[in-house]
A protein has these predicted regions:
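Structured binding/interaction patches within domain cores
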Residues: 2-154, 159, 163-164, 176
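Signal-transducing coiled-coil linker helices
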Residues: 167-168
Length: 177
């Protein structure tokens, strides 16, 4: 995911949001899916507006209504970090070091990657393809680091499908217990 920092900040938040959407479709029950997908829609709409102060509390209230279980924890945690990424992207840091939006987007990716039912290769493929598509579309549209994303960028993106959940990865240490 080294290319993540090379795309605009709101595009980074969109990468995180799209991964969340895939995780939500795979991990949440249908009733909870609608609430979580609503938060994803809010995050996506916030990537189309640059320089606004974002109220994340209403989205956090919606997320708090969803009962956390082992099977949906990664999706809910990733939604939290995607929300943080878009909020951070709206107030870029003037300090040196890692950009808060990039850090939050990476934490979003890590939280989904921590689920043992999801292949690391699957995560790498969907995230890197989103980064490549967004980098091309942003470059084509002349979008800079802290610019909002245009409709042109969104038209370049394919729809998100659910991640494929498999059997939890086997830990070789468990064989010796």
């Amino acid at each position: 995911m080294s290319d993540l920092s090379k795309i605009p900040l709101l595009a980074q938040a969109l990468v995180a949001c799209r991964l969340c959407r895939r995780a939500v479709l795979a991990m949440l029950a249908e009733t909870d899916q609608q609430l979580a997908l609503g938060v994803c829609d809010v995050i996506e709409s916030m990537t189309k507006i640059a320089g606004k102060t974002i109220d994340r509390d209403s989205s956090k209230v919606v997320l708090s209504r969803i009962h956390r279980t082992r099977s949906n924890q990664a999706a809910l945690q990733s939604l939290h970090w995607a929300l943080e990424a878009v909020v951070a992207a709206h107030r870029p840091s003037a300090l040196y070091g890692d950009e808060p939006a990039t850090v939050a987007a990476m934490r979003c990716i890590e939280s989904v990657s921590d689920d043992p039912r999801i292949s690391a290769l699957q995560i790498a493929i969907v995230v890197e393809s989103d980064i490549d598509l967004l980098a091309f579309a942003c470059d084509e549209d002349g979008i800079q680091l802290s610019d909002s994303l245009s409709d042109h960028v969104f038209k370049r993106l394919p729809p998100c499908h659910a991640l494929t959940l498999g059997e939890p990865r086997r830990n070789p240490e468990d064989d010796y217990r």
